[in-house]
């Protein structure tokens, strides 16, 4: 394993393939150490049970973490009918068990159709959502249950990949804030058989569908120069935003906090990708009335 002598300024995004059994924060800290990065953050937790894509932002890339938090996600998951747990996954205690049930392939397909599109979902008590500053999972472990409001989510894709009458494999594309284990549990409830999630793998975060993920073992075996080559440019996380090219004088002005006049045709309040004349990424701007632009989140190393 290559060790890092001292921390350096590193800016970019790494797509980590998080291992099972590790918290997202532990994975972040291990990777941060491998890169010797001064500043790092992840873009939405994966449960310890889960594996798959965990985008990690280093340095100036932490300024665009929110865009990745808000991005759609795609997963592969396995559910098991007949058993419910208090956590809705295989790490919890069994609270319901039924042996005599029959679910046909057609019934499963028909049930999945009910969960496509815009739906409401009640978050699990075993989640990181907070009640008066305390994470719900801590309250749940103390036997305390808090009423949770159903939240609007969007399931844009829900495909049945395998089903043997007991275990079912799904691919799911969904909006932020979707709890896949609760989706699996809800599907089981609709089928009147109960269900819990046994596996969860995040396939990708929107915007990184075709990018490679790296495991911790792979990164550990690389020299630092090769690790750095794994980083993705910051602006790839915001490719869905409209790009705007600024002149040198406009770059200087917006860095000074001034509003610049740039007839973009963008809708007022729309976020924009800002570049200098040499195609260097400047950061995120926001469209104002009459096409003016103000700074929203600028990166500090752009010239």
Swiss-Prot record:
The keyword tRNA processing applies. GO terms for molecular function: RNA binding; tRNA pseudouridine(55) synthase activity. The keyword tRNA processing applies. Its EC number is 5.4.99.25. GO terms for biological process: mRNA pseudouridine synthesis; tRNA pseudouridine synthesis. It is an enzyme of class 5 (isomerase). The lineage of its organism: Bacteria, Pseudomonadati, Pseudomonadota, Gammaproteobacteria, Legionellales. It holds the Pfam family TruB_N. Keywords: Isomerase, tRNA processing. Signal peptide: none annotated. It comes from the Bacteria. Belongs to the pseudouridine synthase TruB family. Type 1 subfamily. This is tRNA pseudouridine synthase B. The active site is at residue 47. Responsible for synthesis of pseudouridine from uracil-55 in the psi GC loop of transfer RNAs. HAMAP family: TruB_bact. It catalyses: uridine(55) in tRNA = pseudouridine(55) in tRNA. InterPro entries: PsdUridine_synth_cat_dom_sf, PsdUridine_synth_N, PUA-like_sf, PUA_sf, tRNA_psdUridine_synth_TruB, tRNA_sdUridine_synth_fam1_C, TruB_C.
